[in-house]
Amino acid sequence: MHPTNTPAVLVTGVTGRIGRLIVDRLLDAGLPVRALVRRPEAAATLPARAEVFTGDLTEPESLDPALTDAGAVFLVWTAPPDSAAAVVARLAARVRRVVLLSSPHRTPHPFFQQPNPMADLHAHIERLIAAAGPEATVLRPGMLASNALAWWAPAIRAGQAVRWPYGTAETAPVDDRDVADVAARALYDPDLAGGDHVLTGPESMTQAAQVRAVGEALGLPVPFEEITPEEFRRVSEGSAPGAVVDMLLGAWNAAVGRPAHVTTAVADLLGEARTFRRWAADHAAAFRPAAS
């Protein structure tokens, strides 16, 4: 537990996969938590113990109430870059520590070196933070395990084959819970201050093997059918921006037949890194067909 006079931690991106988990971790650690939401109705999804503030990264002055007397900020940049400099300047003037959720764009593995507009934006935010001077920790998760929910759960729940490109592309999915655990510690543990951590899962797995792992968690066969990049583009129309689809296809193509970049950062910081198989077992209910 932490002293009652501990400065509050402001968490952005609280309706997202990582931010929501961080709120829980910080509250469990006894820290006062402020949650930034764009819409007041989003407060209904958050724990009552979290103090909710309405603000928008595109309107830097709207952050001032949430930043007053705060000690640290978890920053997920979800806005266009136009307001980034003004937001970072406000953070640097008001809080001691910033933990940024970025990406592994500095990692030389070809998977992370494909054209990626989001990685370019992350690099821009990193430069702004470095110039502004707050104590900063940068977290660089690779592929999140929870992507499987959006990508494959609809087909599996419907009892269908997973139709996906580049089945032999290898990634090392990192459990969202591990990312949140590292981020929460970085927000209050001085030993993690100033770090730069590439966070991956502990094992390189092909995409087809990841689908099989979900099937094993369900105790059901889940067929995997390879489709072409062109077909993937067609079926993705309307559900994902073209730039994102191109980025994914380029990254997967670069990862075919090549072991994924695997780090020990999660285990070094937490003692253990959750495997994708463990993630699949813990989330099997989200994939289970209604009739099974």
Could you describe each region identified by the protein language model?
Residues 55:
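Cofactor-binding loops of NAD(P)H-dependent oxidoreductases
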Residues 213-257, 292:
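Terminal hydrophobic/aromatic helix or amphipathic segment near a protein terminus
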Residues 269-292:
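Amphipathic terminal alpha-helices
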Residues 190, 255, 287-290:
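A general structural signal marking secondary-structure boundaries and capping sites
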Residues 183, 187, 214, 248-252, ...:
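Hydrophobic "lid"/C-terminal helical patch
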Residues 2-45, 58-61, 65-70, 79-86, ...:
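Oxidoreductase cofactor-interface core, primarily capturing Rossmann-like NAD(P)-dependent enzymes
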